[in-house]
Amino acid sequence: MHYRDQSLGELAITIPRATALFREFNLDFCCGGKQTLLRAATKRALDIDMLESRLADLSTQPSTEKDWQQASLGEMIVHIISRFHDRHRAQLPELIRMAEKVERVHHDKPGCPIGLTDQLTLIHDDLTQHMMKEERILFPMIQSGMGTQAGGPISVMEHEHDDAGQQLDVIKSLTNDVTPPDNACTTWRALYTGINEFIDDLMEHIHLENNQLFPRALRGE
């Protein structure tokens, strides 16, 4: 089957394990979910035939993941808050604490991510406000059956998702694509492991909202 003309967002929905493949090759399936596989691969000089082959293999594997296309919008919102919002609130303060320690102790060493603490703090502050707006304004609108009237708030949330994607790019730039040096201490390595987990979670979070929750809400499901 040819997947090259399908969008990354569509593929992430229909082939759940595709998200791991997209992360492996740094393909943005959440904020950039509307671009086709071919366009995304061309931009990163990737072998489109290889990607299609990998996706074909993934599509034949049985999935144990929940099919969110079949879930109610209310169930999806409860999942987003408990699985992602609450987790981000726990993740970021600890990442900021570790980043501050790494910068303070290793500031004179090659590869030290100078500025990482400030960037993580910015993400924390922005994401805290973003999630609060979703929980207090947008999600209640959707849960009360007013999703078709939520175009304005949804547009704002999608714009803020784009901003978050750009902030992740800054994080990757500061951390050598979140790869610690060979001589990195335990805290440094734990910090980067935590950042990779946060990036995975945030991309999955944004994908679920941008490519599933928001379109379904606007259709009045």
From Swiss-Prot:
- Which PANTHER family would you find in this protein's record? IRON-SULFUR CLUSTER REPAIR PROTEIN YTFE
- What InterPro entries does its record include? FeS-repair_YftE, Hemerythrin-like, RIC_family
Instruction: State the GO CC annotations.
Output: cytoplasm
Protein role: Di-iron-containing protein involved in the repair of iron-sulfur clusters damaged by oxidative and nitrosative stress conditions.
What this protein is called in its record is: Iron-sulfur cluster repair protein YtfE
Q: Which Pfam families match?
A: Hemerythrin, ScdA_N
Cellular location of this protein?
Cytoplasm
The main place the protein resides is cytoplasm
Name a GO molecular-function annotation. Answer: metal ion binding
UniProt KW keywords: Cytoplasm, Iron, Metal-binding, Stress response
What are the recorded Gene Ontology BP terms?
Answer: protein repair; response to nitrosative stress; response to oxidative stress
Organism encoding this protein = Dickeya chrysanthemi (strain Ech1591) (Dickeya zeae (strain Ech1591))
Gene responsible for this protein: ytfE
Q: Which family does it belong to?
A: Belongs to the RIC family. YtfE subfamily.
What does the subunit comment say? Homodimer.
